[in-house]
Amino acid sequence: LCLPSGLIWLTFWSTPLRWGGIGFVVAGLLFGLSNVRPDVIVSRDGRAIAVRGADGLLTIAGLGASDFVVRQWLLADGDLRKPDDPLIRRNGFCDPTGSVVRLASGQRVALALRTRALIEDCRKADLVVTPLAKPNNCRADAIDGIMLRQTGALELFADGKGYRIKASRPIGYDAPWAKNRLIKSPSAYDAD
C-alpha cells in the first residue's frame, strides 16, 4: 500500500510537495524486502505441504494438494509457475503412504498419510506432518491432525532451534465458516 501511494503522490503533485511521496516509496520498498517467506507450508487438512528448497523455490508434496491450493501458495510466494509444472514436485520423494522433502538446511520434512509411514518417519525425519494423531513416542517435531483441527493451515519458519509457527486460524477462533473438523482415525486412512 505504501509503494503505490508514494507513486501516486509523486505523479499527481506538481509542487515541491511531490517529493514527500519518496518517503512512501522507500517505506514500501523496505517493507517488501523485510517480508520473510515461510520454510514450510502445511495445508489445513495435513495432506499436502510445500517446502522451500536450497534454490529458494517451493516443492509441493502430498496427494491432497489441489491445483487451487498450489496456485494460492505459489502466488503468495511470488512464484509464477503453474500448478501442473512438473518441476514443482521435483525435490520430493512420494508414494501413496507419504512424501519426504529436504529443506534448504538439509533437514528432512516428512508427510505421513498412513500409520505405517508415520511410525517410520517419526524415527527418521526432523519434522513430520500428518493428518493423523501423532504417536507419543515420536522423536521428530510433529504437526498432526489434532493441532491442524485447531489452527487450520500453517506456515513454519525455521529459526535454528525449531520452528516459529503462524496459524491461519488462531487457537480458540471459531466462526460458522471455519468450524473444527473431525480428524479421521488412522484406520480410515489405511483403508484408502
Language model features by range: what are they?
Residues 1-54:
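Transmembrane helix-bundle segments that form internal channels/tunnels in multi-pass membrane proteins
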Residues 52-192:
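Extracytosolic and intramembrane catalytic regions of membrane-associated proteins
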